[in-house]
UniProtKB/Swiss-Prot annotation:
One of its GO terms (molecular function) is protein-cysteine S-stearoyltransferase activity. It is a multi-pass membrane protein. Residues 296-361 are annotated as: Mediates localization to plasma membrane and recycling endosomes. The lineage of its organism: Eukaryota, Metazoa, Chordata, Craniata, Vertebrata. Residues 299-361 are annotated as: Disordered. A motif (NPxY-like endocytic signal) lies at residues 352-355. This is Palmitoyltransferase ZDHHC2.
Length: 361
């Protein structure tokens, strides 16, 4: 027999699919209400009916496709170079002194493109996955793994939204909003006619009226959520980074990864315009290292700690992290001049001083 702990875990995994099932049932009912009750049973004009059905099915297809991709795209995990080797794990286990353990981790980290730190200035280490976290990577407690460029864990897709599927998530929000707006707009006149008793009471009345209320309500909530994530894309921030700015060697910098709105957009949607509206992976980079452009200190951000050289904080000439050769897709983002609005900026040094390293879950 399976252990009781395993059965309990499996039960919880099943419960995680309830929000997805709820969304699926709502969408399935909306399809029946719109196609059958509105278009087939209520609308009499053949031209109007045909146009509505064509546009509706196009939006429905793109919505389902992007939702599927968001749910079933496996989150990307850090490359093996960031994991501790078997030998390094044994060395850490044998060492009792913290300084000795830090030396081991320091040796591993010095050749990796890791430039973000914990709030205390230590290199970010996950003691559950036994790895040094790449920039923008976080450990998801729900998935129990480290996720590259983690944005958030979304219960409505039962998946982590991160580097592997953030574009799909954005398209899911966009097509969901368009779907709801289209249903609301085309259903409105028949909703009004049923409301004012302009049409006879039939089985379609309930479906058409409730469809209008549901679609309009979802439109409002989706509009706010989509607008927020559009803002995040333009700023090149994740939801986690919006709540807590990433920390670099010089301190926290909420604009540390921003390259300008257009380049930030390309990081998520890619260089190929033909793929921008399709839920096909086209994001730039590998999810482990990101180009960055440091900007002037934000007065709302904490000041540079005493004892640190203020010149380490760049006034912002475009400079990619890491100083090692970047992937071709990352290099393209940094071509053609500086980030918008950068003037008279000092160049940041490429030194990588040893820092205190601590574990971070």
């Amino acid at each position: 027999m399976a252990p009781s702990g395993s059965r309990s875990f499996d039960c919880w995994r099943v419960l995680y699919w309830i929000p997805v099932l709820f969304i699926s049932l709502i969408v399935a009912w909306s399809y029946y209400a719109y196609v059958v009750q509105l278009c087939i049973e209520t609308i009499e004009n053949m031209g109007e009916k045909t146009v509505y059905l064509l546009i509706y099915h196009l939006l429905f297809l793109m919505f389902v496709w992007s939702y599927w991709q968001t749910i079933y795209s496996k989150p990307m995990n850090p490359l093996k170079e960031f994991h501790l080797s078997h030998v390094d794990k044994e060395l850490l286990e044998r060492e009792d002194r913290r300084e000795s353990q830090q030396e081991i981790l320091r040796r591993i980290a010095k050749d990796l493109p890791i430039y973000t730190r914990t709030m205390s200035g230590a290199i970010r280490y996950c003691d559950r996955c036994l790895l040094l976290k790449p920039d923008r990577c976080h450990h998801c407690s729900a998935c129990d793994m480290c996720i590259l460029k983690m944005d958030h864990h979304c219960p409505w897709v039962n998946n982590c939204v991160g580097f592997a599927n953030y574009k799909f998530f954005m398209l899911f929000l966009a097509y969901s909003l368009l779907y709801c707006l289209f249903v609301t707009a085309t259903d409105m006149q028949y909703f009004i006619q049923f409301w004012t008793n302009g049409l006879p009471d039939t089985q379609a009345k309930f479906h058409i009226m409730f469809l209008f209320f549901a679609a309009s309500t979802f439109s409002v909530s989706l509009a706010f959520l989509f607008a927020y994530h559009c803002w995040l894309v333009c700023k090149n921030r994740s939801t986690l980074e919006a709540f807590r700015a990433p920390a670099f060697q010089h301190g926290t910098d909420k604009n540390g990864f921003s390259l300008g709105a257009y380049k930030n957009f390309r990081q998520v949607f890619g260089d190929e315009k033909k793929y921008w509206l399709l839920p096909i992976f086209s994001s730039l980079g590998d999810g482990c290292s990101f180009p960055t452009c440091l900007v002037n200190p934000d007065p709302e951000q904490p000041s540079i700690p005493p004892g640190r050289n203020p010149s380490v904080k760049s006034a912002g000439e475009s400079h990619p992290f890491p100083p090692k050769p970047l992937r071709e897709s990352q290099s393209r983002l940094l071509n053609n001049g500086q980030t918008d609005g950068s003037e008279d900026r000092d160049k940041r040094g490429t030194s990588n001083p040893a820092l205190t390293i601590e574990k971070e879950t």
